Amino acid sequence: MDGGHSPDRHAAAAAGEPVRSRWTPKPEQILILESIFNSGMVNPPKDETVRIRKLLERFGAVGDANVFYWFQNRRSRSRRRQRQLQAQAQAAAAAASSGSPPTASSGGLAPGHAGSPASSLGMFAHGAAGYSSSSSSSWPSSPPSVGMMMGDVDYGGGGDDLFAISRQMGYMDGGGGSSSSAAAGQHQQQQLYYSCQPATMTVFINGVATEVPRGPIDLRSMFGQDVMLVHSTGALLPANEYGILLHSLQMGESYFLVTRSS
């Protein structure tokens, strides 16, 4: 009798690998893990695994093996997503090299209408949706979205789709119009895009998820006198004589509050 232990568990123990156990990470733990993975640490060594496990334990029970297998599975998902993106890019390149995309019925249309913005609008929106929330790829003409910090959690892309579709529709409606109307339309699209951006973002301060405003923040009013903010890499964030940071914090990054020595 093996006392209820499976052969896989014995094999993992014999190979020196961590023993897998069932674990359902909490949302706070997922945020921390995704932030670390997207920062470039995709295969942490043993000492880093222990450090990450201690950080996660603030939000619930977790073992070193859970952290090890989470990164293993996350790397597999990332490679699978990368292959899907490469296949989509190859298909798009093949369609572009073969000329205008085939339509359901292009007969009866005058030459030049088959490739009009109306027929390309669907392809543009589909492409933007396919590229959303990828930590390894970004849409060239748009700023990064919140979803890019969350890996497989598909929160990003909505603002990009809306901006792209409104730009296409403006081109269709204003074809042949004056340059002043085109400039006004572009200004309106920019206002629409920035109005969709949240006023706050989530960072980790001393391991706790914290909502902070975008842009430079006032350290003294938020955290008190004689405090400094240090990035998880050990770099001190510069502030002026009034305690206001010179640069904005970065979404999903980890920081630590340090008391200034007198």
Swiss-Prot record:
This is WUSCHEL-related homeobox 11. Keywords: Developmental protein, DNA-binding, Homeobox, Nucleus, Transcription, Transcription regulation. Induction: Induced by auxin. Transcription factor involved in crown root development. Promotes the development of crown roots (both initiation and elongation), main components of the fibrous root system. Regulates the expression of genes required for crown root development, and hormone-responsive genes involved in cytokinin signaling (e.g. RR1, RR2, RR3 and RR4), and auxin signaling (e.g. IAA5, IAA11, IAA23 and IAA31). Functions dowstream of the auxin biosynthetic genes YUCCA1 in the promotion of crown root development. Interacts with ERF3. Interacts (via N-terminus) with ADA2. Pfam families: Homeodomain (PF00046). Belongs to the WUS homeobox family. It comes from the Eukaryota. Expressed in crown roots. Expressed in the shoot apical meristem (SAM), leaf primordia, and young leaves. One of its GO terms (cellular component) is nucleus. It is found in: Nucleus. Disruption phenotype: Reduced crown root development. Severe growth defects and lethality in adult plants. Residues 1-11 have a biased composition (Basic and acidic residues).
